[in-house]
Amino acid sequence: MNDKTVEFTVGTNIYKLQLKTKQCILLEKKLGQSPLEMLMKLEDGGLPTLNDMITIIAIGMLVHNPSMNENRVADLLDEYVEDGHSYMELLEVIVELLSKSGYINQEL
């Protein structure tokens, strides 16, 4: 079976992200749309809001870090950017997470 997790490194901490069915349903409710719709907007040059990216990462952390919430993820993203990363790099993590969760083919 393929590994369905994505590693998200912040400082010296490595977080495992994974979206199972329950997390996908929660994500759709929180975003008010399917993440697939968000990905289609990317193809048209649109970008997700920072709030949407935080929501995706927070929900992606729930399987392996059940106490994670959006406020804690916002703090992690501050550290992520301070470490020299960009929100575009974060978007790559999100696309990989959505790919491994089955929203898009992994070959894309």
Task: Describe each model-derived feature in a short phrase.
Residues T21-M38:
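Short, surface-exposed, low-complexity cationic segments
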Residues D3, K22, P48, D52:
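Short, well-structured alpha-helical interface segments that form or flank functional binding sites
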Residues M40-I56, G60:
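A short, charged
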